[in-house]
Amino acid sequence: MTQTLILGHERVDDIPLIIGLANKLHLAEVLDHHMGTHRLQQGLHNGQLAVGWLAYILSQADHRKSAVRDWANGRPHTLEYLLGHPIRAVEFSDDRLGGVLYRLSEDATWDAIERSLWTATVTVYEFTLAGIRLDSTTSYGYHRVTDEGVRQRGHSKDHRPDLPQLKVMAAAAEPSGHLIACDVHAGQCADDPLYTPLLQRVRGIVGRPGLLYAGDCKMAALSTRAEIAAHHDFYLMPLPRTGETATQVDSWITAIVEGVQETTLLWDGERMRGAGYEFERPLRAMVDGSPVYWTERVQVVRSPTLAQRQQATLEKRWAAAEAELRALTPPPGRGKRQLRDADTLQAAMTRVLERHDVAGLLTATWERHETTVTGYVGRGRGGPDRPTRTQVQVRYALTGVRRNEEAIAARRHRLGWRVQVTNAPADRLSLCQAVRHYRGGWSLARAFHLLKDLPLGLSPLFVWKAEQITGLTRLLTLALRLLTLVETQVRHGLEQRQESVAGLYEGAPTRTTERPTGTRILQAFARAQLTLTHVRMGRSTGWYLTPLSSLHERLLQHLHLPTSLYTALADNSS
């Protein structure tokens, strides 16, 4: 009797790793507890749906709802084992996933989820919380602007101001960069008033006083600083050069340049981080109708790296301004417009110098050219008896552009200076430590880069309703938390053992690294094409899994995940 061999295949790749990490954080239970599930909904609960969708996003680098259903139906055995529930063909339908986004869009629900998730994260994993970094970013999309929508015209950090924007405010733990809280706002909102609500949420999530909150100059509003000081926390941020503060900052820097104020070299071990000085000043502000008094340390510091960067920018502006000045008075010729008035030339030169911010640094010299032209009066052919008329044509021409070395030297002395403020006592945060802490604030900027880049791809979002835009943005920040955990835990494990890992770079199998990225770690599983094969022949059936390599086992070990996440998928894998 002839028996038919039937083979079925499921690509496993990094799915067990992602869902295993989510299960370790009890993410499905946290989401279920706060989002809830309709009493008539059958099959997977909303928390399980969200975890499955997160696995799809991180594994396939795609956040579209429409593609999740086919992906899940191609892996029923894998997802059933990892999610602990049978997978029906309708589980990951567009309607069900849309319901998850709607529940995630509710502010109270989202706040409760972030509180519980942070508690679960610090319970499972050890985090060094040296401070909290706050910042904002924007995301564009091809959406129609509506009065009540979250997509609005506003400033774009992706250089797409022609498209509607949404704004993401986030707070991350330093130095790990793990997200603590995230708020979604309409794209036209200014940053300044958005810091205080986020600070209040973070304070409730972390539940610890005395933390150091760092941010950029948009966080330096007096009301924001007062809010932090009133709750016995600390802040660190640069002051903006706007309004009255700009005048104060210039005077503090002038005192150094003119030799009135001495500075101290800032050493970090054998590395010099710059120079600077600090002084204290008392501040007062109203918080919730009550006065708040505190002492602020003003730190005027110079960064050699920043000075070099500003010097290079200044030289580019010089060159551009000089080229534009010379182009104002081209040689006479067809199509060459000539300036025939001294006031017009002077006004044009002033506009060029001010536009490139080099006023006083360049001096242009010019001269007046007069040309006498004699012609016949009236129309017609000339002759000896025709009357003539003599005209004097005037044009102005630049003869040179000279750099004012004394003014340039004075400008160079002012390059690289920045003023930052903190209310932390000096015994907790010295001047050098404050400089090092602020300059080391790359963690949240990199988190934003990961959020916008593959596999998450925040821009653009392929949903249209305001609730779904907000919900999907928040779902992607959950995916970012998982991706960050993958990265930080593997790096921590390698650092503890003083090891490096090879095999993560395509085309360079022997290249090693001590700081692998989360994306490359996931790609190491995807490139292996780990496949679960279902073999059926007559009444006999079995599951077989592509063997894990030593690299995969090592990465799982650093993540504190068992290899049984993979091997248990097949009862007779080899």
Name the predicted role of every residue range.
Residues 1-19, 32-574:
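Anion-binding and metal-coordination hotspots
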Residues 22:
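Conserved active-site/ligand-binding neighborhood in enzyme cores
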